[in-house]
Amino acid sequence: MSNILTEICATKAEFVAERKKQIGNNALLDLIKAQTQPRGFRAALEKKRARGQFGLIAEIKKASPSKGLIRSDFTPAAHARDYEEGGAACLSVLTDRPYFQGHEDYLIAARQAVKLPVLRKDFMIDPWQVTEARAIGADAILIIVAALDDQQMQDIEAAALEYGIDALVEVHSHDEMERALKLKSRLIGVNNRDLRDFSVSFDRTYELVGSAPKDCTFVAESGIRNHDDLVAMQRHDIGCFLVGETLMRQDDLRKATKDLLGLS
């Protein structure tokens, strides 16, 4: 695990411990009962693919540890509508507070504004967070293989399955891919960015995808800049993408999404 990831997970453990004291499990279960049914995150991506279209997960992201503030005029509901109108298949919303200036309320606002499925983008280290994710309406959660041991991954995935939501399992290496494939989820995120030096390489992604079973839905993450990148990846059987910063820095999110997807 990289130093920054170790630090983030340690901070997250403290944060989750405090959240558990503030919000009882029964309160979360009551909120889940009031939620609408999960919208089918992986299914939405596959539906786009079946139509010969790109499956875009458009990310609502205010800031990052490495880049600082990304967007000052930050309105999650409006951004969600722009992404939906631009042709995105799904949304991803950052809810991590200390490092990404995210918040659970951002996911709630975004999901209420659209009909798209929404991923809770956060550092999941405890099944309790999955319960909270469903309570605020998330249709999918993120499992970062580099941050967890096998038992932790299984426990978090089991919670997601219990609530009927998808798990996007993120990998960065062959070893992590092997561990990810021990899980039931076949929604695999391949990060183009090397966490050791933050370099971006699509070649690593192509290699990882080429070595994995064909029953997986692969999502390329990080470093995607334009439509040409999507076309290049499609040649390697990658048709789903998670894009955040590239879009969030644009003035017109709707147009930027269309341009990225080649729909302009």
UniProtKB/Swiss-Prot annotation:
It catalyses: 1-(2-carboxyphenylamino)-1-deoxy-D-ribulose 5-phosphate + H(+) = (1S,2R)-1-C-(indol-3-yl)glycerol 3-phosphate + CO2 + H2O. GO terms for molecular function: indole-3-glycerol-phosphate synthase activity; phosphoribosylanthranilate isomerase activity. The keyword Kinase does not apply. The keyword Lyase applies. GO terms for biological process: L-tryptophan biosynthetic process. Keywords: Amino-acid biosynthesis, Aromatic amino acid biosynthesis, Decarboxylase, Lyase, Tryptophan biosynthesis. Its EC number is 4.1.1.48. Pathway: Amino-acid biosynthesis; L-tryptophan biosynthesis; L-tryptophan from chorismate: step 4/5. Belongs to the TrpC family. HAMAP family: IGPS_B. PANTHER family: INDOLE-3-GLYCEROL-PHOSPHATE SYNTHASE, TRYPTOPHAN BIOSYNTHESIS PROTEIN. This is Indole-3-glycerol phosphate synthase. It comes from Zymomonas mobilis subsp. mobilis (strain ATCC 31821 / ZM4 / CP4).
